[in-house]
């Protein structure tokens, strides 16, 4: 069959010029084009298997209403293994499209439903694999999703990844955090858990100088982590080291995202979406300053490097030496990091027709050791 | 082939030897507050419970004894967030480990050593006190 080749859109052309690349433990796409502007993505692996995943989807957001065009961005920071974050990357966007098609529009409910169904389906997979692969019950992931559509940006978050908006202001740029985070080291997250579990004195335990839910996990909401959601998974054959010692009846973690909706103004330059591996080393303001003051090409990799330099400093070593460390043992020096920078154009890229649909999945192929 | 009993016996012997060394070895201390955080080329840094700073060549990260050491450090203190890696052992024990690693042990000896590390950790837990970081420095090559 002959494929039409005369309808290559701007996004396609850009992809050819700036393809996705892998350099050692770094995966990146220095510059691409989404519906409302340019974007840049970069990831670095520290765990023996990359647990972070990410994606960007641009084009129609429903199956039945071509006027609903937009950009979907997802950052998924897995823990206990890569299965949950990979599952989200495979499933959440098709689900979002399905629910958006029902109402023929994007809404907070549509996004929340996509999160809920992704979690529900992952737990179904855990059930299916329970007899042969019970440790799937201890795998989970944070899920940060951004949808830019109709002059609005929806940020939905379960876990502790973060989205920060860069808003130009008096010659500089101001950081506006768009995501609400769920980490036990935030007072708000602790209050929420204590009020949900008033009769459990060990719902939050301080371990290694950090608050952890039941003494095991820092995030207070997540996708997966079946053993903390349903008591039926908190038992044999799941290995004792992954189990809670006591029985519970009420789910300890939930998958509900916190959603914020922001109307974009011409002052809004870009949004940075990243896993906590980045924010551990860079403040919101430091990150937006770097993006504001640097060329767009390769900006995600630049942020990654800034975070790694900071990580090296904390470990009292040189950045060049840090980059030599193999995955696995590298986790003692920094976490897996994913960063996506989405630039916001006040007007869609093409005014007469929509930019070509775009779909990029971050992190493939990636190094893996046993 | 060695049996487990023999391995444990060996491990105990090493611990006794380590205890003997503890009495003899003393560390050079730098007299003034130096720029102790200067990064040595090709090295990573581990602090001990008695606040001695060790800088190891990166190649040590592929040694199984050192990987075990990092694992134990993670179990003991969690992954470090705002600072350097701290081992749950004191400088004397770490010094002793280095000597063994430098001697290039055979597989059986290494196995026994790994067991010994784990048991030493259990006994060191009660006396774990993080002291103020001093200016002691140690470069191991």
Curated annotation (Swiss-Prot), chain A:
SUPFAM superfamilies: PP2C-like. PROSITE patterns: PPM_1 (PS01032), PPM_2 (PS51746). It is found in: Cell membrane. InterPro entries: PP2C (IPR015655), PP2C_BS (IPR000222), PPM-type-like_dom_sf (IPR036457), PPM-type_phosphatase-like_dom (IPR001932). Pfam families: PP2C. Interacts with SAUR19. Interacts with AHA2 at the plasma membrane. This is Probable protein phosphatase 2C 67. It comes from Arabidopsis thaliana (Mouse-ear cress).
From Swiss-Prot, chain B:
GO terms for biological process: auxin-activated signaling pathway. Its main location: membrane. One of its GO terms (cellular component) is plasma membrane. It holds the Pfam family Auxin_inducible. The keyword Oxidoreductase does not apply. Keywords: Auxin signaling pathway, Cell membrane, Developmental protein, Growth regulation, Membrane. Disulfide bonds: none annotated. It is found in: Cell membrane. It is a peripheral membrane protein. PANTHER family: AUXIN-RESPONSIVE FAMILY PROTEIN, AUXIN-RESPONSIVE PROTEIN SAUR61-RELATED. Belongs to the ARG7 family. May promote auxin-stimulated organ elongation, such as hypocotyls, stamen filaments and petals. This is Auxin-responsive protein SAUR64. The lineage of its organism: Eukaryota, Viridiplantae, Streptophyta, Embryophyta, Tracheophyta.
